[in-house]
Protein backbone atom coordinates (compact mmCIF):
# COMPACT_ATOMS: atom_id res chain seq x y z
CA UNK A 1 0.00 0.00 0.00
CA UNK A 2 1.46 3.36 -1.04
CA UNK A 3 1.89 6.05 1.61
CA UNK A 4 0.55 9.53 0.95
CA UNK A 5 2.89 12.53 1.36
CA UNK A 6 1.16 15.36 3.24
CA UNK A 7 1.30 19.16 3.23
CA UNK A 8 0.79 19.46 6.98
CA UNK A 9 0.25 17.16 9.97
CA UNK A 10 -0.52 18.41 13.46
CA UNK A 11 -2.02 16.98 16.65
CA UNK A 12 -4.98 19.15 17.69
CA UNK A 13 -6.32 17.26 20.70
CA UNK A 14 -4.12 15.21 23.05
CA UNK A 15 -5.33 12.98 25.89
CA UNK A 16 -4.18 14.22 29.30
CA UNK A 17 -6.53 15.17 32.11
CA UNK A 18 -9.32 14.58 29.57
CA UNK A 19 -9.81 12.25 26.64
CA UNK A 20 -10.92 13.35 23.17
CA UNK A 21 -12.97 11.40 20.65
CA UNK A 22 -15.28 11.75 17.63
CA UNK A 23 -13.69 14.35 15.30
CA UNK A 24 -15.75 16.65 13.09
CA UNK A 25 -14.32 19.11 10.56
CA UNK A 26 -15.79 21.88 8.43
CA UNK A 27 -14.07 24.28 6.02
CA UNK A 28 -15.54 27.74 5.42
CA UNK A 29 -14.03 28.55 2.05
CA UNK A 30 -14.71 32.30 1.88
CA UNK A 31 -13.20 32.80 5.31
CA UNK A 32 -10.42 30.26 4.64
CA UNK A 33 -11.25 28.90 8.08
CA UNK A 34 -11.32 25.36 9.41
CA UNK A 35 -13.33 24.46 12.49
CA UNK A 36 -12.25 21.24 14.20
CA UNK A 37 -14.65 19.81 16.79
CA UNK A 38 -14.33 16.86 19.17
CA UNK A 39 -15.98 15.37 22.23
CA UNK A 40 -14.13 16.16 25.45
CA UNK A 41 -14.59 13.19 27.78
CA UNK A 42 -13.70 12.43 31.38
CA UNK A 43 -12.42 9.04 30.12
CA UNK A 44 -12.37 7.41 26.69
CA UNK A 45 -15.70 5.60 27.24
CA UNK A 46 -18.95 6.86 25.71
CA UNK A 47 -20.62 7.12 29.12
CA UNK A 48 -18.07 9.74 30.17
CA UNK A 49 -18.61 12.13 27.27
CA UNK A 50 -19.13 15.68 28.48
CA UNK A 51 -18.88 18.76 26.23
CA UNK A 52 -17.57 19.71 22.79
CA UNK A 53 -14.31 21.50 22.17
CA UNK A 54 -13.33 23.52 19.12
CA UNK A 55 -10.10 24.64 17.51
CA UNK A 56 -10.18 27.27 14.79
CA UNK A 57 -7.67 27.11 11.95
CA UNK A 58 -6.75 29.91 9.53
CA UNK A 59 -5.59 28.62 6.16
CA UNK A 60 -2.88 30.58 4.33
CA UNK A 61 -3.25 29.87 0.61
CA UNK A 62 0.23 31.25 -0.09
CA UNK A 63 2.11 28.97 2.31
CA UNK A 64 -0.47 26.16 2.22
CA UNK A 65 -0.39 25.89 5.98
CA UNK A 66 -3.04 26.15 8.69
CA UNK A 67 -2.43 28.17 11.84
CA UNK A 68 -4.49 26.75 14.71
CA UNK A 69 -5.81 28.73 17.66
CA UNK A 70 -6.10 27.39 21.20
CA UNK A 71 -8.80 24.95 22.25
CA UNK A 72 -12.11 26.41 23.42
CA UNK A 73 -15.13 24.73 25.00
CA UNK A 74 -18.45 25.11 23.16
CA UNK A 75 -20.46 25.65 26.33
CA UNK A 76 -23.74 26.39 24.53
CA UNK A 77 -23.88 22.87 23.04
CA UNK A 78 -25.26 21.41 26.23
CA UNK A 79 -28.70 20.24 27.37
CA UNK A 80 -29.04 20.23 31.14
CA UNK A 81 -28.71 16.79 32.67
CA UNK A 82 -27.31 15.33 29.44
CA UNK A 83 -23.93 14.69 27.87
CA UNK A 84 -23.16 16.04 24.39
CA UNK A 85 -22.12 13.55 21.71
CA UNK A 86 -21.56 13.19 17.94
CA UNK A 87 -20.80 16.72 16.68
CA UNK A 88 -22.16 17.40 13.17
CA UNK A 89 -21.31 20.83 11.68
CA UNK A 90 -23.35 22.17 8.75
CA UNK A 91 -22.91 25.50 6.95
CA UNK A 92 -25.79 27.09 5.03
CA UNK A 93 -24.07 29.15 2.32
CA UNK A 94 -27.27 30.99 1.41
CA UNK A 95 -28.05 32.31 4.90
CA UNK A 96 -24.44 32.19 6.15
CA UNK A 97 -25.58 30.26 9.20
CA UNK A 98 -23.44 27.61 10.84
CA UNK A 99 -25.29 24.78 12.58
CA UNK A 100 -23.79 22.35 15.06
CA UNK A 101 -26.05 19.33 15.41
CA UNK A 102 -25.51 16.74 18.12
CA UNK A 103 -27.24 14.24 20.35
CA UNK A 104 -27.74 14.83 24.06
CA UNK A 105 -27.90 11.64 26.15
CA UNK A 106 -29.32 11.67 29.67
CA UNK A 107 -26.78 11.31 32.48
CA UNK A 108 -24.36 8.44 31.96
CA UNK A 109 -26.87 6.04 30.41
CA UNK A 110 -25.05 4.02 27.76
CA UNK A 111 -26.16 3.13 24.26
CA UNK A 112 -26.03 -0.53 25.32
CA UNK A 113 -28.47 0.14 28.16
CA UNK A 114 -30.90 1.85 25.80
CA UNK A 115 -30.70 -1.09 23.39
CA UNK A 116 -31.29 -3.56 26.22
CA UNK A 117 -34.22 -1.71 27.80
CA UNK A 118 -35.72 -0.10 24.71
CA UNK A 119 -35.96 3.19 26.63
CA UNK A 120 -34.72 6.03 24.42
CA UNK A 121 -33.08 8.79 26.48
CA UNK A 122 -31.35 10.51 23.53
CA UNK A 123 -32.38 13.96 22.28
CA UNK A 124 -31.73 15.77 18.98
CA UNK A 125 -30.23 19.23 19.49
CA UNK A 126 -28.43 22.01 17.68
CA UNK A 127 -26.87 25.41 18.20
CA UNK A 128 -26.27 28.02 15.49
CA UNK A 129 -23.76 30.75 14.73
CA UNK A 130 -23.91 33.71 12.34
CA UNK A 131 -20.26 34.71 12.83
CA UNK A 132 -18.55 31.49 11.75
CA UNK A 133 -18.45 29.88 15.16
CA UNK A 134 -17.14 32.80 17.22
CA UNK A 135 -20.40 33.04 19.16
CA UNK A 136 -23.29 30.59 19.41
CA UNK A 137 -27.01 30.62 20.08
CA UNK A 138 -28.65 28.91 23.01
CA UNK A 139 -29.28 25.20 22.52
CA UNK A 140 -32.47 24.05 20.81
CA UNK A 141 -33.99 20.64 21.53
CA UNK A 142 -35.60 19.55 18.25
CA UNK A 143 -36.74 16.12 19.42
CA UNK A 144 -40.45 16.74 19.92
CA UNK A 145 -40.98 18.91 16.83
CA UNK A 146 -38.84 16.84 14.45
CA UNK A 147 -39.09 13.23 15.66
CA UNK A 148 -42.31 13.43 17.67
CA UNK A 149 -44.00 10.19 18.72
CA UNK A 150 -41.63 8.18 16.51
CA UNK A 151 -39.02 8.74 19.24
CA UNK A 152 -40.64 6.01 21.34
CA UNK A 153 -40.34 3.54 18.45
CA UNK A 154 -36.56 3.80 18.58
CA UNK A 155 -34.38 2.25 21.29
CA UNK A 156 -31.86 5.01 20.58
CA UNK A 157 -30.43 7.02 17.67
CA UNK A 158 -27.46 9.09 16.61
CA UNK A 159 -26.34 11.67 14.06
CA UNK A 160 -23.37 11.56 11.71
CA UNK A 161 -20.92 12.05 13.18
CA UNK A 162 -18.95 14.60 11.16
CA UNK A 163 -19.85 17.08 8.45
CA UNK A 164 -23.37 17.36 7.00
CA UNK A 165 -24.55 18.48 3.55
CA UNK A 166 -26.26 21.37 1.78
CA UNK A 167 -27.71 20.39 -1.59
CA UNK A 168 -27.25 22.38 -4.80
CA UNK A 169 -31.01 22.50 -5.44
CA UNK A 170 -33.01 25.75 -5.52
CA UNK A 171 -34.05 25.42 -1.89
CA UNK A 172 -30.50 24.82 -0.71
CA UNK A 173 -31.85 21.86 1.26
CA UNK A 174 -29.98 20.84 4.40
CA UNK A 175 -29.28 17.18 5.25
CA UNK A 176 -28.11 15.77 8.57
CA UNK A 177 -27.17 12.08 8.24
CA UNK A 178 -28.42 9.91 11.07
CA UNK A 179 -29.30 6.39 12.15
CA UNK A 180 -31.78 4.82 14.56
CA UNK A 181 -32.18 1.47 16.26
CA UNK A 182 -35.80 0.64 15.57
CA UNK A 183 -37.54 -1.63 18.04
CA UNK A 184 -38.38 -5.08 16.69
CA UNK A 185 -40.84 -7.76 17.86
CA UNK A 186 -39.93 -9.03 21.36
CA UNK A 187 -37.64 -11.84 20.20
CA UNK A 188 -35.46 -9.56 18.07
CA UNK A 189 -32.92 -6.95 19.16
CA UNK A 190 -33.34 -3.38 17.88
CA UNK A 191 -31.95 -3.08 14.35
CA UNK A 192 -29.98 -0.07 13.05
CA UNK A 193 -30.92 1.80 9.88
CA UNK A 194 -29.56 5.03 8.43
CA UNK A 195 -31.65 8.00 7.27
CA UNK A 196 -31.46 11.80 7.05
CA UNK A 197 -33.03 14.73 8.84
CA UNK A 198 -34.08 17.21 6.12
CA UNK A 199 -34.85 20.92 5.94
CA UNK A 200 -36.04 22.79 2.85
CA UNK A 201 -36.42 26.16 4.61
CA UNK A 202 -32.87 26.79 5.84
CA UNK A 203 -33.36 25.07 9.17
CA UNK A 204 -36.63 26.67 10.27
CA UNK A 205 -38.30 23.25 10.23
CA UNK A 206 -36.97 19.70 9.95
CA UNK A 207 -38.48 16.40 8.87
CA UNK A 208 -37.55 12.73 8.99
CA UNK A 209 -36.44 11.02 5.83
CA UNK A 210 -37.19 7.36 5.25
CA UNK A 211 -34.88 4.58 6.33
CA UNK A 212 -32.20 2.84 4.35
CA UNK A 213 -32.31 -0.96 4.60
CA UNK A 214 -31.08 -2.51 7.84
CA UNK A 215 -27.42 -3.01 8.77
CA UNK A 216 -26.54 0.67 8.33
CA UNK A 217 -25.30 2.80 11.22
CA UNK A 218 -23.10 5.89 11.43
CA UNK A 219 -23.07 7.51 8.02
CA UNK A 220 -22.22 10.49 5.85
CA UNK A 221 -23.80 11.82 2.66
CA UNK A 222 -22.61 13.54 -0.52
CA UNK A 223 -24.29 14.91 -3.64
CA UNK A 224 -23.20 13.37 -6.95
CA UNK A 225 -24.29 13.56 -10.58
CA UNK A 226 -25.35 16.51 -12.74
CA UNK A 227 -28.54 18.49 -13.28
CA UNK A 228 -31.70 16.41 -13.02
CA UNK A 229 -29.50 13.34 -12.50
CA UNK A 230 -28.23 14.58 -9.14
CA UNK A 231 -28.64 12.07 -6.33
CA UNK A 232 -27.74 11.93 -2.66
CA UNK A 233 -25.13 9.26 -1.98
CA UNK A 234 -25.04 7.71 1.51
CA UNK A 235 -22.13 5.65 2.83
CA UNK A 236 -22.67 3.86 6.15
CA UNK A 237 -20.94 1.75 8.74
CA UNK A 238 -22.09 -1.85 8.97
CA UNK A 239 -21.27 -5.13 10.69
CA UNK A 240 -21.22 -7.03 7.38
CA UNK A 241 -17.45 -6.92 6.90
CA UNK A 242 -17.75 -4.05 4.40
CA UNK A 243 -19.41 -0.66 4.06
CA UNK A 244 -22.88 -0.24 2.64
CA UNK A 245 -24.04 2.51 0.30
CA UNK A 246 -27.42 3.74 -0.91
CA UNK A 247 -28.66 6.52 -3.17
CA UNK A 248 -31.63 8.86 -3.03
CA UNK A 249 -33.23 10.43 -6.13
CA UNK A 250 -35.34 12.87 -4.09
CA UNK A 251 -32.98 14.91 -1.93
CA UNK A 252 -32.48 12.35 0.83
CA UNK A 253 -36.13 11.58 1.53
CA UNK A 254 -36.11 8.01 0.17
CA UNK A 255 -33.15 5.69 -0.35
CA UNK A 256 -33.00 2.69 -2.63
CA UNK A 257 -31.91 -0.64 -1.15
CA UNK A 258 -28.38 -0.49 0.13
CA UNK A 259 -25.46 -2.20 -1.60
CA UNK A 260 -22.50 -3.84 0.09
CA UNK A 261 -19.25 -2.17 -1.00
CA UNK A 262 -16.81 -5.07 -0.80
CA UNK A 263 -13.74 -2.93 -1.58
CA UNK A 264 -14.37 -0.78 1.51
CA UNK A 265 -13.65 -3.26 4.29
CA UNK A 266 -14.93 -2.98 7.85
CA UNK A 267 -13.44 -4.46 11.04
CA UNK A 268 -15.75 -6.96 12.82
CA UNK A 269 -17.90 -4.35 14.62
CA UNK A 270 -17.46 -1.70 11.96
CA UNK A 271 -16.03 1.81 12.26
CA UNK A 272 -17.09 5.28 11.24
CA UNK A 273 -15.73 6.58 7.93
CA UNK A 274 -15.91 9.86 6.04
CA UNK A 275 -16.98 10.55 2.45
CA UNK A 276 -16.94 13.78 0.48
CA UNK A 277 -17.70 14.78 -3.11
CA UNK A 278 -15.51 17.12 -5.14
CA UNK A 279 -15.41 18.38 -8.75
CA UNK A 280 -13.71 16.09 -11.23
CA UNK A 281 -10.26 17.66 -11.75
CA UNK A 282 -9.48 15.92 -15.03
CA UNK A 283 -10.41 16.87 -18.56
CA UNK A 284 -11.35 13.39 -19.72
CA UNK A 285 -14.32 13.50 -22.08
CA UNK A 286 -16.08 10.59 -20.38
CA UNK A 287 -15.47 11.78 -16.82
CA UNK A 288 -18.37 12.43 -14.47
CA UNK A 289 -18.52 15.87 -12.94
CA UNK A 290 -18.12 14.70 -9.34
CA UNK A 291 -15.81 12.17 -7.71
CA UNK A 292 -15.83 10.77 -4.18
CA UNK A 293 -13.08 10.55 -1.58
CA UNK A 294 -13.39 8.30 1.47
CA UNK A 295 -11.27 7.71 4.61
CA UNK A 296 -11.43 4.71 6.94
CA UNK A 297 -9.16 2.12 8.60
CA UNK A 298 -7.92 -0.31 5.94
CA UNK A 299 -7.63 -3.48 8.06
CA UNK A 300 -10.56 -5.92 8.09
CA UNK A 301 -9.47 -7.33 11.47
CA UNK A 302 -9.10 -4.21 13.59
CA UNK A 303 -9.15 -0.42 13.50
CA UNK A 304 -5.71 0.25 12.13
CA UNK A 305 -3.89 2.01 9.25
CA UNK A 306 -6.09 4.86 8.04
CA UNK A 307 -6.45 4.92 4.27
CA UNK A 308 -7.95 7.19 1.64
CA UNK A 309 -9.93 5.76 -1.27
CA UNK A 310 -11.05 7.35 -4.57
CA UNK A 311 -14.11 6.63 -6.70
CA UNK A 312 -14.30 8.25 -10.14
CA UNK A 313 -17.72 6.66 -10.83
CA UNK A 314 -19.47 7.40 -7.54
CA UNK A 315 -22.60 5.27 -7.91
CA UNK A 316 -20.72 2.10 -8.86
CA UNK A 317 -19.66 0.24 -5.68
CA UNK A 318 -17.10 -1.80 -7.64
CA UNK A 319 -15.00 1.15 -8.85
CA UNK A 320 -13.41 2.23 -5.57
CA UNK A 321 -9.63 2.39 -5.78
CA UNK A 322 -7.22 0.54 -3.57
CA UNK A 323 -6.38 2.69 -0.53
CA UNK A 324 -3.43 4.99 -0.12
CA UNK A 325 -2.11 5.04 3.45
CA UNK A 326 -2.60 8.26 5.44
CA UNK A 327 -1.58 7.07 8.92
CA UNK A 328 -0.25 3.88 10.51
CA UNK A 329 -1.14 2.24 13.81
CA UNK A 330 -4.47 2.25 15.58
CA UNK A 331 -6.73 4.80 13.85
CA UNK A 332 -10.50 5.08 13.99
CA UNK A 333 -13.02 7.85 13.23
CA UNK A 334 -12.21 10.53 10.66
CA UNK A 335 -13.78 13.51 8.88
CA UNK A 336 -12.87 14.97 5.48
CA UNK A 337 -13.21 18.42 3.94
CA UNK A 338 -12.52 19.72 0.43
CA UNK A 339 -10.29 22.81 0.61
CA UNK A 340 -10.19 23.80 -3.07
CA UNK A 341 -7.03 23.72 -5.18
CA UNK A 342 -3.72 22.73 -3.66
CA UNK A 343 -0.21 23.89 -4.56
CA UNK A 344 0.11 21.23 -7.28
CA UNK A 345 -3.16 22.31 -8.93
CA UNK A 346 -5.13 19.26 -7.82
CA UNK A 347 -7.90 19.27 -5.18
CA UNK A 348 -6.71 19.69 -1.61
CA UNK A 349 -8.28 18.03 1.43
CA UNK A 350 -8.18 18.32 5.18
CA UNK A 351 -8.68 15.22 7.34
CA UNK A 352 -9.26 15.11 11.09
CA UNK A 353 -8.83 11.64 12.57
CA UNK A 354 -8.39 9.61 15.74
CA UNK A 355 -4.88 8.23 16.15
CA UNK A 356 -2.49 6.44 18.50
CA UNK A 357 -5.07 4.21 20.20
CA UNK A 358 -7.48 7.13 20.79
CA UNK A 359 -4.76 9.16 22.53
CA UNK A 360 -4.90 12.02 20.05
CA UNK A 361 -6.89 13.61 17.25
CA UNK A 362 -4.71 14.69 14.34
CA UNK A 363 -5.24 17.07 11.42
CA UNK A 364 -3.50 16.43 8.15
CA UNK A 365 -3.71 18.08 4.75
CA UNK A 366 -2.93 16.53 1.37
CA UNK A 367 -3.74 16.85 -2.32
CA UNK A 368 -5.39 14.36 -4.63
CA UNK A 369 -2.21 14.21 -6.70
CA UNK A 370 -0.20 13.30 -3.61
CA UNK A 371 -2.64 10.51 -2.74
CA UNK A 372 -3.29 9.21 -6.27
CA UNK A 373 -0.51 10.35 -8.62
CA UNK A 374 -1.43 7.74 -11.24
CA UNK A 375 -4.76 9.48 -11.86
CA UNK A 376 -2.89 12.49 -13.19
CA UNK A 377 -0.06 10.59 -14.82
CA UNK A 378 -2.57 8.79 -17.03
CA UNK A 379 -3.93 11.96 -18.65
Curated annotation (Swiss-Prot):
Catalytic site: 46 (proton acceptor), 333 (nucleophile), 354
Motif FRIP motif: where in chain: 20-23
Gene3D superfamilies documented for this protein: 2.120.10.10
Plastid recorded as keyword: no
Entry EC no(s): 3.2.1.18
Keywords on record: Carbohydrate metabolism, Cytoplasm, Glycosidase, Hydrolase, Lipid degradation, Lipid metabolism, Repeat
Keyword check for Lipid metabolism: yes
Swiss-Prot/TrEMBL catalytic activity: Hydrolysis of alpha-(2->3)-, alpha-(2->6)-, alpha-(2->8)- glycosidic linkages of terminal sialic acid residues in oligosaccharides, glycoproteins, glycolipids, colominic acid and synthetic substrates
Entry GO MF terms: exo-alpha-sialidase activity
Main subcellular location: cytoplasm
Per-repeat ranges for BNR: 127-138, 197-208
SUPFAM superfamilies with a match to the protein in the record: Sialidases (SSF50939)
EC main group: hydrolase
A biological process term (GO) from this entry: oligosaccharide catabolic process
UniProt cross-references to InterPro entries, sorted A to Z: Sialidase, Sialidase_fam, Sialidase_sf
Localisation: Cytoplasm
Binding site for substrate: 21, 41, 179, 181, 218, 237, 303
GO cellular component, one term: membrane
Similarity remark: Belongs to the glycosyl hydrolase 33 family.
Main function: Catalyzes the removal of sialic acid (N-acetylneuraminic acid) moieties from glycoproteins, oligosaccharides and gangliosides.
Name the record gives this protein: Sialidase-2
Amino acid sequence: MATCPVLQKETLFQTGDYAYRIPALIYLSKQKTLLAFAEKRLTKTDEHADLFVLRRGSYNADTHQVQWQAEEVVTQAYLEGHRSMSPCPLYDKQTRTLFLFFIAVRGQISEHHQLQTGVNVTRLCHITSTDHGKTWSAVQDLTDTTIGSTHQDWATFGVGPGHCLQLRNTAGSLLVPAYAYRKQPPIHAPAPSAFCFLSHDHGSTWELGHFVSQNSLECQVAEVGTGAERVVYLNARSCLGARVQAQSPNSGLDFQDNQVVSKLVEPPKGCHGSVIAFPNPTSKADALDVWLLYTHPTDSRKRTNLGVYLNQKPLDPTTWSAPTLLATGICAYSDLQNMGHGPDGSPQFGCLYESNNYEEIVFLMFTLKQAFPAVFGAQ
